[in-house]
Amino acid sequence: TLFVCLSHSSEPCRGRDIGLIARASHVCGAEAIAPERRQLAAAAPYGEWLIAGRILLSDLPDREHVVHTHASVTRRQQVFGYTEEELRLILAPMASTGIEPLGSMGTDTPLAALSDKPRLLFDYFSQLFAQVTNPPLDAIREELVTSLYNTIGPECNLLDPGPASCRRLVLPFPVLDDDALSKIVKINREGDLPGYQTYVARGLYEVDGGAAALTARLEELCAEISAAIADGARIIVLSDRHSNAELAPIPSLLFTAAVHHHLVREKSRTQVGLIVEAGDVREVHHVALLIGYGAAAVNPYLAIESVEDLARHQVYTSVAPEKAVGNVIKALGKGVLKVMSKMGVSTVASYTGAQIFEALGLSREV
């Protein structure tokens, strides 16, 4: 057991580094630990590994931008239960200002568990906040210590660092637009990034089968993703695109959490990164939940295509389509930072998989 006493130190130490030298059994200042620092820094060419290994999203080749028709956007809005109120009061203000809209005077909407209307799975969860022991951050005035930067890909053994430990795709923001996701889906198509492969899992199930079909499909998807990892996939995209009258989308939160915990049980979670391509995401709370339950990044494709369509037709917003999309992504990302800061979490990397939420009205099985 090592006992440390600081009360007899005569040196001022406020704002200075301190070090714990285990073999000397005492705490010392920055000058005393300088040799150990230099020794650790020179143990390996860490800087060279980082520069050579990091993969920047901006360096990936651009892909074709797809513009969806108004009829296509409207049809999918109906599939995912979009309302006129959400378009007018939530998405349009974000598209115009780049800031999450604020309301006042509370809400008379009943809890999702007590409502007689269909509700999204997101609505059954509420965010936790810091109480006493874990002080929150001020996401505005203390922005310097926060980061929305993340990396994705296989994680190597922390106790055996090497060049492979730095072979990661850098994501500057946790919310991706369609073009950025297209880059990731088609990564290594030209064979320029060996060892990186993306697998897209389609989260759709047969409508006629009901709950039993949903459960069976989730089990199939988990097995499918495990097989993809064994075949070399290092990025998994969980997508609910291409739904139709026969195939309904699985709620993205249920899909993400099921895959995340399956991979944890299989001890293969650190071999891949998860990205969610979801049509049911249109609020900050939705993005925060998906990240909290395992996603490294989220592509709210229908929200993006909706504001792009609104801007093209100058409905509820007067900004250009490209500006509207950028503003929505900015608003959602900054909103996630606000949610994280309420629990004292400063980086999105620490928030990924943290599950700092509570559920009301869901069975233990769900």
Where are these regions (language model features)?
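A glycine-centered beta-loop-beta connector
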Residues: T1-L2, R16, H242, L247
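Flexible, glycine-rich loop/tail regions that form catalytic "lids" or insertion modules at the edges
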Residues: L2-T215, E224-A228, G232-I235, H286-V287, ...
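Conserved structured catalytic cores and adjacent interaction surfaces
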Residues: Q197, G209-A216, E220, S226-H286, ...
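Short beta->alpha connector loops at strand-helix junctions that form conserved
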Residues: S239, P300-A303
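Short, acidic/small-residue loops that bind anionic groups at enzyme active sites
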Residues: H262, L302, A324
